[in-house]
UniProtKB/Swiss-Prot annotation:
Free-text function comment from the UniProt entry: Required for rescue of stalled ribosomes mediated by trans-translation. Binds to transfer-messenger RNA (tmRNA), required for stable association of tmRNA with ribosomes. tmRNA and SmpB together mimic tRNA shape, replacing the anticodon stem-loop with SmpB. tmRNA is encoded by the ssrA gene; the 2 termini fold to resemble tRNA(Ala) and it encodes a 'tag peptide', a short internal open reading frame. During trans-translation Ala-aminoacylated tmRNA acts like a tRNA, entering the A-site of stalled ribosomes, displacing the stalled mRNA.
Organism domain of life: Bacteria
The name this protein goes by in its record: SsrA-binding protein
One GO cellular component term noted in the UniProt record for this chain: cytosol
Glycoprotein is among the record's keywords: no
Alphabetical list of PANTHER family matching this protein: SSRA-BINDING PROTEIN (PTHR30308:SF2), TMRNA-BINDING COMPONENT OF TRANS-TRANSLATION TAGGING COMPLEX (PTHR30308)
Family: Belongs to the SmpB family.
Amino acid sequence: MDIVVENRKVRFNYFIIQEFDAGIVLIGSEVKSLRQRKVSIAEAYVTERNMELWLCNLHISEYNQASTRNHNPTRPRKLLLRKKQIYKISGNIKNDGFTVVPLCLYFNDKGIAKVKVVIVKGKKLHDKRETIKTRDWNREKSRILRGGN
């Protein structure tokens, strides 16, 4: 599994409820830009239209060696999932407090582009502070066990 890009802010800003691996419909110049890691998923989110899931605001830069007919960098891209998974995700999109965002974009062992989407619930400010405290304590604990300062 070759991870192209990961949205690390998701783990800090949200509680992860459930993860799904989804295929993504891309054109050739988009795949080549992905292989060059010219992609940003910081502002991306998943929406539902006509019982299909779409990944919006995923920015894949234009491929320089492509012809003049290059792709639109922020166009909505269709996600490929099983019907049961689509029903589960679309039901959570309609619930208050839940959202669906991409966690990472990667190429699997066969070289196919996949996106890991997660159902998340937003954290409050005190939850974020608690996350920081536990992370710092674990770091300090490992330092003490190693015998360092």
